[in-house]
Design a protein with these regions (language model features):
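Conserved catalytic cores and adjacent C-terminal regulatory segments
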Residues: 3-135, 155-168, 175-180, 188-192, ...
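Ankyrin-repeat inter-repeat connecting loop/turn
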Residues: 109, 141-143, 175, 208-209, ...
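Ankyrin-repeat boundary/linker signal
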Residues: 112, 144-146, 178, 211-212, ...
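Start-of-repeat signature of ankyrin repeats
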Residues: 116, 148-149, 182, 216, ...
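Extended, amphipathic alpha-helical scaffolds
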Residues: 187, 287-288
């Protein structure tokens, strides 16, 4: 009775095990099976029937036995037994290492999952490399399965068996074999174990690594499609060719499509021509296929051509417009995309922006140099398209084109309306911001009537200027240095010569100092404009104060890591900074020349106080870093902080320096080298709106309600002190103007009115475009003034270069 109960309980346990873990390999005791009946037996395997289930065991040695599965169905148990025994017996006979619990588990799992695999395939997958040293096995080393047609080599790679893979290749495994999808061992290595690729390449004599699968894809293409950087790197090192494909796309294109920039970088570093490779369908390059700002930035840094044409006649800028990828448009422009290039219909990006009725894009393209009078193949200008448009923004866009120089259509033009017809006088509608800026600029023109700028109106004898200095002074202002660049580009256009050749002295503070150095080193203004826009993303990272290493890396790259100030020969450059390790603080001038007057050091000064390096030892990038070390934005550079703390408008300091330079020449009996100042051009980074301040009172509070008034008053007082310390408009301009007027020196001050106080570290693209557009409006309003400056500078240049 008791024995029956125990047997019944064991039966229940066996059935439960058969239901919940039927295929887990378990170490069992031989004595537990002595009283059981055998259902089947084949070699090392026996199928027992016990307590309502069927138990398949493998006998390894007289004392070791493992249960492979436990099933309740007779038919299923018999089928599994025959499937496993037909393969496992062969494996056990040739590889004793299989007789371990883990190995048996792997082997039985593989047999159940891959019915068509032969013992050779299973041995390859499990890494039983000793299995392949026997002659009868070697004759079947390239056998394919009946279903997927995979070879033992492919299976070994799938199982990540490096040693077995190498053993198979040494014993004659063929790399030419392909499965029913056309995939080679390389394709399998890409998907399953890239570390096998170097082993495969050692036995590859015919560039099988570049074979296509059934889809026309090489192993490199598949690696790029799946974003497998290790596989891409291994294939490139093994000699894979990125130009080989039977698809429309090359590996680099599919890598970009999957947004894997690391793979693109790997390919393009080894094969730079892939930056310009064209896909077959449209003939587009990587620049055409970019989908986000980060992709464009990386491609541009790698050296792609942002103006390359596709086979359909489109630049990357045209494609980004059609795909509405605004961030990509901005990034392309920053890296030099040409807004004047047309597509097959002759439409420039400005034409397309007008057709899209997009005010922001119209502004953007005008700011970045679009020709507002270019005609497409239908002889239509952007102004004509705006005039005949029926969309809601047509009137504002028409006015934007008008003030940017957009001319009316010719008399023989067809389909014109009042906004573009030759005899018309309608020029569109001014939006509120433009109206405000243009009105304020008219006030600025009246303001200049009281300056010595009137001298530019006279017929100047330019020969008198041959022995006079032409001086350019650039204010500080962070990202608002873009406004300086726009005005300089306008002057450059008016003069018709590079801005570097227009001046003998260039000075700058902070952002103006960086710009002065860039100009003196021959960097084009459009390049500097792109650099400044990139600066907001590459330098202003995180929160204030920003890490200086990004700023310093950029400066070293752009200005040179080892170049010193005296490497700049012409024009002479002055960059301002403040020595903050002493009280009172002291203005310091970084010069590209040696001063003619000796500066004497106080013998009693502390030994640890910084002594600035002479010009022939002063690194250029460090001078720019020191001048731009704005408090709360960046940590100080050694003892230096931003020059704007004393000379945010460096005009008077520059004039003083030139006067002292001439005095020094006279003291050295070099009076023949003395040149007086001939003209001064001073550029500012914008005049912000005047706002109300309630109070600057700081007092002892008598009650809790006074605390808020105290805080507000203290904040206003601090702001006022900072504003006055960094003042660049108003009194500094008036003093400079008066200084020049008294000496009969032509003086020109340009500084646009802007609609808001844009922060020095502004990140927002829309805000940046807005202030650049307002500067464009200012340039248009002051065109006559700028033209006179350009005319004078060009006249002097022509006389000097006769």
């Amino acid at each position: 009775m008791f024995r029956n109960i125990v047997d019944g309980f064991k039966g229940l346990v066996d059935v439960a095990g058969a239901n919940y873990s039927p295929y887990s390999v378990q170490n069992v005791k031989i004595e537990d099976y002595k009283s059981m009946s055998k259902r089947l037996e084949d070699g090392h395997l026996i199928l027992y029937k016990k307590h309502g289930c069927y138990d398949c065991v493998v006998v390894g040695t007289p004392v070791k036995m493992w249960s492979l599965f436990r099933l309740t169905s007779d038919g299923e148990a018999v089928a599994q037994f025959k499937l496993i025994s037909s393969k496992l017996n062969i494996l056990i006979a040739r590889s004793s290492s299989l007789l371990l619990e883990n190995n048996l588990q792997k082997a039985t799992d593989v047999i159940r999952e891959h019915h068509s695999w032969t013992p050779i395939h299973i041995a390859a997958y499990l890494g039983l490399y000793e299995f392949f040293s026997q002659p009868d096995i070697l004759s079947k080393i390239n056998d394919k399965t009946t279903t997927t047609e995979v070879t033992p080599l492919m299976v070994a790679i799938t199982g990540s068996q490096l040693q077995c893979t190498e053993q198979l290749l040494k014993n004659g495994a063929s790399l030419y074999m392909q499965d029913n999808s056309g995939e080679t061992a390389y394709h399998y290595a890409v998907k399953h174990h890239p570390k096998c690729i170097p082993i495969l390449s050692q036995f590859d004599r015919d560039s099988i690594k570049d074979f296509f699968n059934g889809k026309g894809q090489t192993a490199l293409f598949v690696a790029c499609e799946k974003g497998l950087s290790e596989a891409v790197e291994q294939l490139l090192y093994a000699g894979a060719e990125p130009n080989v494909t039977a698809c429309d796309l090359l590996p680099v294109h599919i890598a970009l499509k999957t947004n894997n920039m690391s793979n693109i970088e790997l390919i393009c570093e080894k094969f730079p021509d892939q930056l310009f490779a064209k896909e077959k369908k449209y003939g587009g390059t990587l620049a055409h296929w970019a989908r986000n700002r980060e992709s464009v930035e990386k491609l541009c840094k790698l050296g792609c051509d942002v103006n390359i044409m596709s086979d359909t006649g489109h630049t990357p800028l045209h494609i980004m417009l059609k795909k509405n990828r605004g961030e990509c448009i901005m990034e392309l422009l920053v890296y030099g995309a040409d807004t004047r290039l047309g597509d097959t219909d002759g439409n420039t990006p400005l034409h397309l922006a007008v057709e899209k009725d997009d005010i922001e894009l119209v502004r953007l393209f005008i700011i970045f140099g679009a020709d507002v009078n270019t005609q497409n193949r239908k002889n239509e200008t952007p102004r004509h398209l705006a005039a005949v448009s029926k969309k809601k923004n047509r009137d504002v866009i028409l006015y934007m084109l008008h003030i940017s120089g957009g001319r009316r259509c010719r008399k023989n033009a067809h389909g014109c309306l009042k906004g573009c017809v030759m005899e018309g006088n309608y020029n569109g509608t001014v939006d509120d911001t433009m109206q405000h800026v243009m009105t304020l600029d008219r006030e600025a023109i009246l303001d200049d009537m009281f300056s010595s700028f009137e001298d530019f109106d006279q017929d100047v004898d330019t020969s008198n200027f041959l022995r006079k200095h032409r001086v350019l002074c650039l204010d500080g202002g962070g990202i608002r240095g873009l406004l300086l660049i726009q005005m300089l580009m306008a002057i450059e256009d008016a003069a018709g010569i590079p801005i570097k050749d227009c001046f003998d002295w260039i000075s700058g503070t902070s952002t103006g100092g960086l710009l002065a150095l860039g100009i003196a080193m021959g960097k084009p203004l459009p390049y500097m404009k792109g650099l400044y826009v990139r600066l907001k993303d590459e330098v202003f990272k995180g929160s204030r104060p920003y890490p200086a290493e990004f700023f310093e890396t950029m400066l070293k790259k752009e200005l040179g890591e080892t170049k010193v100030m005296t490497d700049i020969k012409e024009p002479k450059v002055i960059v301002t900074a403040v020595l903050a390790d002493r009280h009172p603080s002291q203005l310091h001038l970084f010069r590209s020349y040696h001063p003619t007057l000796q500066t004497y050091q106080d013998e009693n000064q502390p030994k640890d106080r910084l002594v600035p390096s002479p010009p022939d030892e002063q690194l250029i990038w460090l001078a720019a870093r020191s001048s731009g070390a704005a408090p709360t934005y960046f940590n100080q550079a050694k003892a230096f902080v931003d020059g704007g703390m004393i000379a945010n408008n460096p005009t008077l300091d520059t004039l003083t320096e030139i006067h002292q330079y001439n005095c020094g020449l006279k003291l050295r009996n070099e009076g023949h080298l003395v040149k007086p100042i001939g003209c001064v051009v001073s550029l500012g980074t914008g005049r912000i709106p005047v706002t109300s301040v309630q109070s600057v009172n700081v007092f002892r509070p008598e009650g809790i309600l006074d605390v808020k008034r105290l805080v507000n008053g203290f904040t206003a007082l601090v702001n006022m002190m900072v504003d006055q310390a960094t003042l660049s408009e108003g009194p500094p301009v008036d003093r400079s103007r008066a200084w020049c007027s008294m000496l009969n020196i032509p003086f020109c001050r340009l500084s646009p009115r802007i609609s808001e106080d844009f922060p020095l570290d502004c990140h927002d693209d829309k805000s940046i475009i807005q202030m650049m557009w307002e500067t464009q409006c200012y340039i248009v309003a002051n065109k006559a003034k700028i033209d006179k400056v350009g005319k004078l500078l060009r006249s002097i240049y022509d006389v000097k270069n006769v």
